[in-house]
Every structure is written in structure tokens, then in C-alpha cells.
UniProtKB/Swiss-Prot annotation:
Protein family according to the UniProt entry: Belongs to the UPF0270 family.
Gene3D superfamilies: YehU-like
InterPro entries named in the record: UPF0270 (IPR010648), YehU-like_sf (IPR036685)
NCBIfam families: PRK04966.1
Pfam families: UPF0270
Listed name of the protein: UPF0270 protein YE3952
TM annotation in the entry: none
């Protein structure tokens, strides 16, 4: 189920974004980006609708994923 990011408390959203970025461990190539920059990148994706907050009833977890992956039914993958 998609959770509208606008309805999430700002501090909670900040914590979700930071936890997501730290968990992903994405390699940005030659130029390392700060945690704050990575968090803002993900925030922009949420605002633009490219990414969505998803609640998994199966796993009782919240995740951030590309909108297209959610539509493809990937929200219940481990």
C-alpha cells in the first residue's frame, strides 16, 4: 500500500529517508556524495512521484521504491 509522503510527520520522513540511504549503500562513482545530498536526492524522487513510500502488510515494514516497481507488484518481495 502506498503511503502519501505528505501525510508522514517531517521528522519521521527524515528518519525514513536517512535509514533508506544508509541501507542502500549505493556507489556514486568517482565523486562521493554526502548523506545529506543522498537524502535530498531520494526526497526529490518522492516529491516528483518517481519514488513512493510503501507499507508491506506481509513483512510489516515500510520501504521506498520506484513507482514502477510498486505497480509491478514488487512491494511484497523480501
Amino acid at each position: 500500500m502506498i503511503i502519501p509522503w505528505q501525510q508522514v510527520d517531517s521528522e519521521t520522513l527524515d528518519n525514513l529517508l536517512e535509514a533508506f540511504v544508509l541501507r542502500e549503500g549505493t556507489d556514486y562513482g568517482e565523486h562521493e556524495r554526502s548523506l545529506e545530498q543522498k537524502v535530498e536526492d531520494v526526497r526529490r524522487q518522492l516529491v516528483s512521484g518517481e519514488a513512493v513510500l510503501v507499507w508491506s502488510e506481509l513483512h510489516e515494514t515500510i520501504n521506498i521504491m520506484p513507482r514502477g516497481a510498486f505497480r509491478a507488484g514488487a512491494e511484497e518481495l523480501p
